[in-house]
C-alpha cells in the first residue's frame, strides 16, 4: 500500500529519506531544523503529516514493516527542539493550514529572548504533549526497526571490522548528533570487537594483555629501546617507535608516545605509536640502533604456538621476556661486530676498540679541593676479553686521565659516583661531540657510589672470584691462584670500578669476561714508552688532525695486517713502543728474517695461511665463551683453527719451523698444540647441517643426547601412524589408499576431486582446508590430532637441540685459554709480516739500538707525509746525544717545514721502538721512556682557560714528568702573550730543560733573541739550526723558495709577509705591512748598533768581561 504522504513529498516540513546503501548501516543524525523553516511551518503540511502517521499506525497492526528500502517520510525528531520560535500550543493555533508560506514579522530582542524556550521549560504550553508523544513513539519504533536491519546486515557482511563497518564508524564519527540526546538503543548495542592495540577504549585506560606485558618490561628498563617480537615481526611501541623511525628510516604509526597514563595523551589517543621490522632483519636494525648510541633490548616470545596450544595457558597471551640487551661496547652477537668487515689497509675509517671504561675518583689525601684527585679505572673489551686497569693521582689539568682515555678510546663510559668539575668537563669534551677524538659519540652511563663503597666492592669482588678459585684445575691452580690473588689485592679505587663493572656487565650476561684473569693488564706498567694524549694527537699516532680518520696516521702507515685480530694487536704495539732492548731486538730481528729473500717460500706460506682466515677468531672465541655463538659460526671457527693447526702439524719443536728468530718460532710452535682438541669437537658435528644452521641434525647420531633421540623417535612414531592412516582414510572414500599432499606449507592434505563420486563420501567430520574448482583438500580428525602431537615433539626437539648446543659451547669454553693463545700467536705473526712488508719498501733501514740515550739519524724522512706526497720528500739528519748536543733551537720562515722536521724525529724514534724499520739511510736509537709534545694552540673555554694558560699548564706537566731519557718537543712556546714575557718564559723553560732535566729537546721558536743562549753552553749542549730557504727579488717582487733542509745557524727573519701573500690577503694591506715591517726592523737594527758601539767602547776602555768578545762577535753577525 502506498504511503499517504507520498503526494506531499515536496512539503517543506518533511524530508524524504534517500534509498542508498548507507541507509542500511548509518544512523541518520536527527538535527534540528533551521529557525526560518521551523517558524514558518504551515498547518497543511503538519495536518498531512498527522494523517499519514495515523494511517501508518493502522497499517502496522495488520503487517509489520520489514523492508526499509521503500521511500518513507521522516519528520525531524522533535525530542528536544531548540528553535528561535516555540512549539505551537495546539494545531488550532496554526493559522490557515492551506495558505502558502508567509514570513512572520521581525521579532524584537526582548521577544526573541522570551520565546527562546525548550519543551521541558515550565512556560511551554503542555497541550502539545499528546501529539509530541505520538511523534516520539513513531520515531522510536522506526529507529528500532532500522537498528535491527543494520545488525542483520553487519552480521551478513562479517563484523564491524569489515570495510562497511569501518565506513559506518567513520560516518558516525564525522557527523555527530548535535543538540540531541544519545539514543538508548545505541548505547545498549554491543560494541564491535576490536583487534590488537585498538582494544584500548577511547578515553579509557583499558590495555590489551600484550600492551601490559610491554609496559611491565618498559618500566624496568626506561633507558632502553625495546624491540618486541609479535608474531612474524618485531615491533617498537610508544617513544621507542619514534626513535626507531628516526634512526632506521621506517614508518611510525601515530599514537601515544608515553607509557604512563598522562592526561595530555590518554584523553584523545587509544593506542601506542608503533613501528615494525621483519624478523629476519632484526640483527641489521639492532646494529644500526646500537651504533647510533642507543641501549637496545630484544623482547622475545619464549614459547611457541604448538607448545602453547598444548599447555594450560592456551588462552593467555604469549609469554615474553627481555632476552638480550645491547650497547656499543656489549654488542657481540655478530661476528663482525659494529665495525663491519675488515677494512682495506688504506681505508680511512677509524677501527673501534670496543672498550667499556669505568672511572671513579676521590680527592687526593691532603687536598680538600679538586686540584688533585686519586683516580681508578677499569676498561674491558667484551669482544676480546682484554681488561686494563690503573690507579693514579692526577693534577688540575687532568692530563693523566686524558692520556688513558685517548689510549683506550672507549665507546662507552661508566661513571661511578660524582666526578670533579675538571674531570667532568674533560669527559664531556672527549665524548660529547660527533667528531670527537674517539671517532664517534661515546655513550655515558652513571651509577651511584655509597660512602661504604670500598668495603662493599671488596666483598662483592671476593665473592665473585671465590667460586672461580674453587673450580681452578690442579694444573692451573698455582697460576690461577696467583692471578686471582693479584685481582683481590687491587687498589681501592680500582676495586670499586671492578665491582661496578661486574654488576654492569651482568645486565648484558657478559660478567664471565672477568673470570679470564690471565688477561688483566696494568695500564701504567713501565715496560713501554709513554705516549700521552697530547702526543697521540700532535704526532697523529691513531688519527689525523684534519678529519679524525686513520688515513695519514702512523697506524695507517704501518697497518698491512690481513686479519682483524692482527690489526688490533698492531694498534696496541703502535701505542705502546717497547722499552726492553732485548725484546725489541728480538722483534726487529724477526722482521729482518721475514724480509730476507731466502725465506720467501716460508713467508708466502704464512701469508697464504693468514689470507685463508676470513673470520675474526678472537671475537668468535669470546662469543663461544659467552655462549652466544651460532652453529655456522662455530663450524667456521673450528674448521679455521683446524686448518691453522694442520698447516704446521709437522712442527714438534722450535727447530722444526725453519726460522732462526725466537719470536717467530714461539708463535709457530704454539699453533699445532690445539689440533687434538679442535678435531675432537669437530667429530661431534655434522658439517652439512652446521653450514645450513640445521639444529635438528647438527650433531652426528652417535653424539646426540638421550633427549634428542627420544623426541626424534616420537616424531618418527607419529609419522608412521600418519602413513598407516592413509588406508583408513581411503576406505572411507571407497579407495584402497590415498596420497597426502602438501600445499602452501600445509602437510598431510587429502585431495578429493570435486567431479568424482568420492566427494559424496567425505565424512562431515573431515575439515576442508582449501580447494580449487577441480579438487577439495581435507584434514581428517585423526590427522589433525597426530599433526598436533608431531608439532609438540618438534618443539621439544628444538629445545633439546638448543640445550645440547649450549652444552657443547660450554665444553669448548673450557679450552678458551689455549685456543686464545694460538690466535694471539697468529696475530703476532700477522703483525711481524706487516712490519716486514713496510721494511721491504725502498729507503727503509733496520735501526741500531743502544742503551745510551741518543737519536742519530742520517737522511731521515717523515713516514706519513712521504706516503701521501706525490713529490719526493726532502730528507734531513738529526743528531741528539745526552752527552753532547741535547737540544736544538729550530728557527726558520713560516711554512718552512719546522714542525714536520721535529715530528719526523719523534715518529722515527717511536717506529724504532715498535720494532719496525725506519725511513732513513741509517739510524742509531737509544731507549726513550717517553715522548712529550707541546704543539698547536687552542683554548679550553669549558674550563675557562685561555690559550696561554693551556700552553703553560701542558708545559708544566712536561717539566714534571720528563726524564733524561725523554724526548721533548716544544713548538713556539710563549707566543700567547707579549713578546717580552714570551721570550722570558721560553728562555727559562729551554734553559731548565737543557741544564736540569737534561732531556733530548727540540725547541721551535720565532724569537731570534733566544739564539744567543747557545753561547752560555760551553759543550754545545744547545745548538742553533734553521730551515734553509732562498730569497730572490726585492720589495714587492720578493719571493721565498723553501728548501726544507736543516742548516746550522739562525734564521733572522720569519717571512710572515710571504705567507700572507700566499694566503691572498689584499695587495694594499701587504704593502702597508711591508712598510711597517721595514720601519720596525730598522728601529731594532739601530738599537743593536748602539749597543754594539757601547760594547766596543767598553772593550777599548779595558773591560775585564770574558764574554764581551763573544757578544761582540754575535752582535756583529746579527747585524
UniProtKB/Swiss-Prot annotation:
GO molecular function, one term: mismatched DNA binding
Biased composition (Polar residues): 1-12, 25-37, 95-111
GO biological process, one term: mitotic recombination
Organism: Aspergillus niger (strain ATCC MYA-4892 / CBS 513.88 / FGSC A1513)
Subunit (UniProt): Heterodimer consisting of msh2-msh3 (MutS beta). Forms a ternary complex with MutL alpha (mlh1-pms1).
Task performed by this protein: Component of the post-replicative DNA mismatch repair system (MMR). Heterodimerizes with msh2 to form MutS beta, which binds to DNA mismatches thereby initiating DNA repair. Msh3 provides substrate-binding and substrate specificity to the complex. When bound, the MutS beta heterodimer bends the DNA helix and shields approximately 20 base pairs. Acts mainly to repair insertion-deletion loops (IDLs) from 2 to 13 nucleotides in size, but can also repair base-base and single insertion-deletion mismatches that occur during replication.
Major location (coarse): nucleus
Compositional bias segments (type: Acidic residues): 175-188
Annotated compartments: Nucleus
Region entry Mispair-binding domain, spans: 201-329
Region of interest: Disordered: 1-20, 25-143, 174-207
GO CC field: nucleus
SUPFAM superfamilies xref list: DNA repair protein MutS, domain I, DNA repair protein MutS, domain III, P-loop containing nucleoside triphosphate hydrolases
Origin: domain of life: Eukaryota
Pfam families, per the entry: MutS_I, MutS_II, MutS_III, MutS_IV, MutS_V
Family: Belongs to the DNA mismatch repair MutS family. MSH3 subfamily.
Protein name from the UniProt record: DNA mismatch repair protein msh3
Amino acid at each position: 500500500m502506498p504511503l499517504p504522504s507520498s503526494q506531499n513529498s515536496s512539503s517543506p516540513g518533511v524530508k524524504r529519506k534517500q534509498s542508498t546503501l548507507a541507509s542500511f548501516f548509518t544512523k541518520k543524525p536527527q538535527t534540528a531544523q533551521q529557525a526560518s523553516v521551523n517558524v514558518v511551518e504551515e498547518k497543511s503540511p503538519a495536518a498531512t503529516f498527522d494523517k499519514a502517521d495515523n494511517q501508518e499506525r493502522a497499517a502496522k497492526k495488520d503487517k509489520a514493516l520489514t523492508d526499509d528500502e521503500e521511500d518513507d517520510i521522516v519528520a525531524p525528531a522533535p525530542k528536544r527542539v531548540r528553535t528561535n520560535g516555540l512549539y505551537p500550543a495546539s494545531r488550532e493555533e496554526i493559522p490557515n493550514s492551506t495558505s502558502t508560506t508567509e514570513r512572520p514579522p521581525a521579532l524584537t530582542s526582548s521577544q526573541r529572548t522570551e520565546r527562546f524556550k525548550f519543551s521541558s521549560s515550565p512556560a511551554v504550553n503542555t497541550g502539545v504533549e499528546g501529539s509530541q508523544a505520538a511523534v516520539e513513539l513513531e520515531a522510536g519504533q522506526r529507529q528500532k526497526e532500522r537498528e535491527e536491519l543494520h545488525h542483520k546486515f553487519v552480521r551478513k557482511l562479517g563484523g564491524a571490522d569489515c570495510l562497511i563497518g569501518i565506513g559506518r564508524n567513520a560516518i558516525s564519527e564525522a557527523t555527530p548528533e548535535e543538540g540531541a540526546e544519545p539514543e538508548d538503543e545505541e548505547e545498549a548495542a554491543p560494541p564491535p570487537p576490536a583487534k590488537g592495540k585498538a582494544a584500548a577504549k577511547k578515553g579509557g585506560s583499558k590495555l590489551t594483555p600484550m600492551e601490559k606485558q610491554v609496559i611491565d618490561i618498559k618500566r624496568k628498563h626506561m633507558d632502553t629501546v625495546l624491540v618486541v617480537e609479535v608474531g612474524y615481526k618485531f615491533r617498537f611501541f610508544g617513544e621507542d617507535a619514534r626513535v626507531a623511525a628516526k634512526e632506521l628510516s621506517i614508518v611510525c604509526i601515530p599514537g601515544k608516545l608515553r607509557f604512563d597514563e598522562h592526561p595530555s595523551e590518554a584523553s584523545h589517543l587509544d593506542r601506542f605509536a608503533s613501528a615494525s621490522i621483519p624478523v629476519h632483519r632484526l640483527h641489521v636494525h639492532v646494529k644500526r640502533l646500537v651504533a647510533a648510541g642507543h641501549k637496545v633490548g630484544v623482547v622475545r616470545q619464549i614459547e611457541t604456538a604448538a607448545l602453547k596450544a598444548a599447555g594450560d595457558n592456551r588462552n593467555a597471551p604469549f609469554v615474553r621476556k627481555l632476552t638480550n640487551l645491547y650497547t656499543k661496547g656489549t654488542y657481540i652477537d655478530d661476528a663482525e661486530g659494529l665495525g663491519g668487515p675488515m677494512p682495506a689497509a688504506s681505508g680511512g675509517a677509524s677501527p673501534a676498540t670496543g672498550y667499556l671504561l669505568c672511572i671513579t675518583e676521590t680527592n687526593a689525601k691532603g687536598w680538600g679541593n679538586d686540584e688533585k684527585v686519586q683516580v681508578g679505572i677499569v676498561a674491558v673489551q667484551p669482544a676480546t676479553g682484554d681488561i686494563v686497569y690503573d690507579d693514579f693521582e692526577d693534577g688540575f689539568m687532568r692530563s693523566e686521565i686524558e692520556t688513558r682515555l685517548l689510549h683506550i678510546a672507549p665507546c662507552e663510559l661508566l661513571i661511578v659516583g660524582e666526578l670533579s668539575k675538571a674531570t667532568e668537563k674533560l669527559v664531556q669534551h672527549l665524548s660529547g661531540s660527533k667528531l670527537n677524538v674517539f671517532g664517534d659519540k661515546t655513550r655515558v652511563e652513571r651509577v651511584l657510589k655509597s660512602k661504604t663503597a670500598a668495603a662493599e666492592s671488596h666483598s662483592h669482588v671476593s665473592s665473585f672470584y671465590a667460586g672461580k678459585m674453587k673450580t681452578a684445575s690442579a694444573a692451573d691452580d698455582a697460576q690461577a691462584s696467583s692471578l686471582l690473588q693479584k685481582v683481590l689485592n687491587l687498589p681501592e679505587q680500582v676495586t670499586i670500578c671492578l665491582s661496578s663493572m661486574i654488576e654492569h656487565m651482568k645486565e648484558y650476561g657478559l660478567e664471565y669476561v672477568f673470570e679470564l684473569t690471565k688477561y688483566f693488564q696494568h695500564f701504567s706498567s713501565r715496560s713501554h714508552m709513554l705516549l700521552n694524549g697530547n702526543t697521540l694527537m700532535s704526532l697523529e699516532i691513531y688519527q689525523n688532525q684534519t678529519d679524525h680518520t686513520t688515513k695519514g696516521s702512523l697506524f695507517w702507515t704501518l697497518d698491512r695486517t690481513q686479519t682483524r685480530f692482527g690489526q688490533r694487536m698492531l694498534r696496541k704495539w703502535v701505542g705502546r713502543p717497547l722499552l726492553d732492548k732485548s725484546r725489541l731486538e728480538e722483534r726487529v730481528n724477526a722482521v729482518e728474517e721475514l724480509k730476507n729473500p731466502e725465506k720467501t717460500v716460508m713467508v708466502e706460506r704464512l701469508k697464504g695461511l693468514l689470507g685463508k682466515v676470513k673470520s675474526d677468531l678472537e671475537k668468535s672465541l669470546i662469543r663461544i665463551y659467552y655462549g652466544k655463538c651460532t652453529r655456522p659460526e662455530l663450524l667456521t671457527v673450528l674448521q679455521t683453527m683446524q686448518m691453522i693447526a694442520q698447516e704446521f702439524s709437522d712442527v714438534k719443536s722450535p727447530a722444526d719451523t725453519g726460522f732462526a728468530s725466537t719470536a717467530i718460532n714461539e708463535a709457530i710452535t704454539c699453533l699445532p698444540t690445539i689440533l687434538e682438541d679442535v678435531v675432537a669437537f669437530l667429530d661431534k658435528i655434522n658439517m652439512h647441517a652446521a653450514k645450513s644452521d640445521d639444529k635438528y641434525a647438527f650433531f652426528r647420531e652417535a653424539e646426540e643426547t638421550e633427549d634428542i633421540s627420544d623426541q626424534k623417535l616420537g616424531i618418527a612414531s607419529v609419522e608412521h601412524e600418519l602413513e598407516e592412516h592413509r588406508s583408513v582414510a581411503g576406505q572411507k572414500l571407497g579407495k584402497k589408499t590415498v596420497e597426502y599432499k602438501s600445499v602452501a606449507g600445509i602437510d598431510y592434505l587429502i585431495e578429493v576431486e570435486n567431479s568424482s563420486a568420492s566427494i559424496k563420501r567425505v565424512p562431515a567430520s573431515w575439515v576442508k582446508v582449501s580447494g580449487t574448482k577441480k579438487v577439495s583438500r581435507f584434514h581428517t580428525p585423526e590427522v589433525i590430532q597426530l599433526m598436533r602431537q608431531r608439532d609438540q615433539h618438534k618443539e621439544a626437539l628444538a629445545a633439546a637441540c638448543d640445550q645440547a648446543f649450549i652444552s657443547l659451547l660450554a665444553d669448548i669454553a673450557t679450552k678458551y685459554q689455549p685456543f686464545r693463545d694460538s690466535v694471539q700467536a697468529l696475530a703476532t705473526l700477522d703483525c711481524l709480516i706487516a712490519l716486514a712488508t713496510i721494511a721491504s719498501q725502498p729507503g727503509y733501514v733496520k735501526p741500531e739500538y743502544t742503551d745510551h740515550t741518543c737519536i742519530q739519524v742520517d737522511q731521515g724522512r717523515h713516514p706519513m707525509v712521504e706516503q701521501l706526497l706525490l713529490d719526493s720528500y726532502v730528507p734531513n739528519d738529526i743528531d741528539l746525544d745526552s752527552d753532547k748536543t741535547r737540544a736544538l733551537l729550530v728557527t726558520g720562515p713560516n711554512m718552512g717545514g719546522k714542525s714536520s722536521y721535529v715530528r719526523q724525529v719523534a715518529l722515527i724514534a717511536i717506529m724504532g721502538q715498535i720494532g719496525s724499520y725506519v725511513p732513513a739511510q741509517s739510524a742509531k736509537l737509544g731507549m726513550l721512556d717517553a715522548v712529550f709534545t707541546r704543539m698547536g694552540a687552542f683554548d679550553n673555554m669549558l674550563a675557562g682557560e685561555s690559550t696561554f694558560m693551556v700552553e703553560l699548564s701542558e708545559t708544566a706537566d712536561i717539566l714534571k714528568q720528563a726524564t733524561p731519557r725523554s724526548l721533548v718537543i716544544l713548538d713556539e712556546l710563549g707566543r700567547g702573550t707579549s713578546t717580552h714575557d714570551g721570550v722570558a718564559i721560553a728562555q727559562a723553560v729551554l734553559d731548565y730543560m737543557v741544564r736540569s732535566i737534561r732531556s733530548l729537546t727540540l725547541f721551535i721558536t720565532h724569537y731570534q733573541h733566544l739564539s744567543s743562549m747557545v753561547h752560555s753552553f760551553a759543550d754545545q749542549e744547545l745548538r742553533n739550526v734553521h730551515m734553509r730557504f732562498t730569497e730572490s727579488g726585492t720589495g714587492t717582487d720578493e719571493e721565498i723558495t723553501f728548501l726544507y733542509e736543516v742548516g746550522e745557524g739562525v734564521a733572522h727573519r720569519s717571512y710572515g709577509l710571504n705567507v700572507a701573500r700566499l694566503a691572498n690577503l689584499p695587495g694594499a694591506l701587504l704593502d702597508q705591512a711591508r712598510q711597517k715591517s721595514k720601519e720596525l726592523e730598522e728601529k731594532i737594527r739601530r738599537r743593536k748598533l748602539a749597543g754594539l758601539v757601547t760594547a766596543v767602547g767598553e772593550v777599548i776602555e779595558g773591560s775585564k768581561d770574558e764574554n764581551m768578545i763573544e757578544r761582540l762577535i754575535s752582535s756583529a753577525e746579527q747585524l
